[in-house]
């Protein structure tokens, strides 16, 4: 008679087979994502085709490394290992890597990241910085061996020889290139004497240019203190670095031209033009002054200068005569007023006037004293009355007469309304405070 196996024994045996099978250690699988709902850490979903379904698990560390957003219904290529879960006896694939299926995988990744960054405001015009009109020092983040730096040096030297160019060498493609580009941009921003940055590389495939589509590079350009001009690939190539940069140039030469908007020839032409304008303006001013001088020489004032002050002499004589008449009239008026005052003073008995005013002063003093006494007595009576009223309201005097003050939650209680059994009250008495609990409430008239 054959021995019967337990379910757990069989499951352990199958798990051992799964774990030891080299073909299940690394499985390359294509399937459609199903039952996907993003979770905070590890991700659990299914992969299916038209005939079968397999459960899939992706740990948080691997999921964070994905360069695209996993979506329901997306067809993906995954790499992982197959394992058996003993408690349920089901098998699943532990996904280590994943990418969209088909030749458009990078395009999908590009569009997803572009949408994400756009919604976060990375590409908004309000964040764009202006390119300075005049620069003294330009930083260039690119490969030291490519044609980019040579084209930029040649163009800048031709357009404005005095501008200094500082190269920040970096990898522009391959593993780790994106992180190195981002770090180099941050390093360039530490240079206080730089006016702007040119970030770029020459042409290549989408894979070659992909470092400039990485989120870390976009963030480094966005956070840059310095204005950034991007020059990645050829005119038909567009990367996310181009969207976030303050200006985008199709070629390194175009980037150098954007970095030096005003050339040495422009400045010399401007100076020459200003010199000519100043010269012509000076000539016109001199001619105008000469014409005015000739007209002045021909005027009557210069031919007969004595006529210049004839009118002033006549006006001075008139003013002198008016002053004499005015002083004489005022003196006569003063003398008349003095005579009238003298006559009035002679008709006044000064002693009697003084006696009358003295009597008035005495009466005013008596009236003032009487009024002040009356007002004082009245105010004193009102004060004493108010003082008595205040004293009667003093809580300490109230409790001294045998009364008590009752409060509930620091609020004065004057009626049984709102008081319930079990309430805690504070009773203030002459010599202390009682904390009491209400046992019964009865309403009675006193």
Curated annotation (Swiss-Prot):
GO terms for biological process: DNA catabolic process. The keyword Nucleotide-binding does not apply. InterPro entries: Exonuc_VII_L (IPR003753), Exonuc_VII_lsu_C (IPR020579), OB-fold_nuc-bd_dom (IPR025824). Its EC number is 3.1.11.6. It catalyses: Exonucleolytic cleavage in either 5'- to 3'- or 3'- to 5'-direction to yield nucleoside 5'-phosphates. It is found in: Cytoplasm. It comes from the Bacteria. GO terms for cellular component: cytoplasm; exodeoxyribonuclease VII complex. GO terms for molecular function: exodeoxyribonuclease VII activity; nucleic acid binding. Keywords: Cytoplasm, Exonuclease, Hydrolase, Nuclease. Pfam families: Exonuc_VII_L, tRNA_anti_2. Heterooligomer composed of large and small subunits. HAMAP family: Exonuc_7_L. Belongs to the XseA family. Bidirectionally degrades single-stranded DNA into large acid-insoluble oligonucleotides, which are then degraded further into small acid-soluble oligonucleotides. This is Exodeoxyribonuclease 7 large subunit.
